[in-house]
């Protein structure tokens, strides 16, 4: 019953703006689940739901995984809008950006926590990325190109 309820909760928060535990409990009751606010509270904790402000200024429950995907999309957009070229030179990856954008692009790359990176250095329009091996440098170039090309 718990897994069915959890599935229903995910379905509800994806389709309806739920701002409070009471609203979620009400929606679950409409769907035929007999729940208390304490049960809903535990479910929210177990499902790792978080509240996020929507574009209308209201806070609603969302799934952390969706938050991660949204962050990756934002960081990919930064790269897509700033990077002009990417190449690997031995264990280094050289990323060229539009003027003044290297720091923002490097921060996006660092925030993505790409495991193959040992470190980044950003200038005004160039980023040097030290990678742990030649193979991983080639992989990183492919990953960055994939992000900027969509």
UniProtKB/Swiss-Prot annotation:
Broad class of where this protein is predominantly found: cytoplasm
MF (Gene Ontology): arginine binding; DNA binding; DNA-binding transcription factor activity
Keywords linked to the UniProt accession: Amino-acid biosynthesis, Arginine biosynthesis, Cytoplasm, DNA-binding, Repressor, Transcription, Transcription regulation
One GO CC term, this protein: cytoplasm
Compartments, record wording: Cytoplasm
Record organism: Clostridium perfringens (strain 13 / Type A)
Protein name, as recorded: Arginine repressor
This protein's pathway: Amino-acid biosynthesis; L-arginine biosynthesis [regulation]
One Pfam family recorded for the sequence: Arg_repressor
Disulfide bonds: none
Family, per entry: Belongs to the ArgR family.
Reported function: Regulates arginine biosynthesis genes.
GO terms under biological process: L-arginine biosynthetic process; protein complex oligomerization; regulation of arginine biosynthetic process
């Amino acid at each position: 019953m718990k897994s069915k309820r959890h599935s229903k909760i995910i379905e509800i928060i994806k389709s309806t703006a739920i701002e409070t535990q009471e609203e979620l409990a009400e929606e679950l009751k409409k769907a035929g689940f007999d729940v208390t606010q304490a049960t809903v509270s535990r479910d929210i904790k177990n499902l790792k739901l978080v509240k996020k402000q929507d574009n209308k200024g209201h806070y609603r429950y969302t799934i952390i995984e969706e938050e991660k995907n949204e962050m990756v999309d934002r960081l990919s957009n930064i790269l897509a809008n700033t990077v002009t070229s990417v190449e690997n030179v031995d264990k280094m990856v050289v990323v060229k950006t539009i003027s003044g954008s290297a720091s923002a692009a490097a921060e996006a790359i660092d925030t993505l926590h790409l495991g193959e990176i040992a470190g980044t250095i950003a200038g005004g329009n160039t980023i040097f990325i030290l990678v742990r091996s030649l193979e991983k440098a080639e992989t990183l170039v492919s990953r960055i190109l994939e992000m900027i090309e969509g």
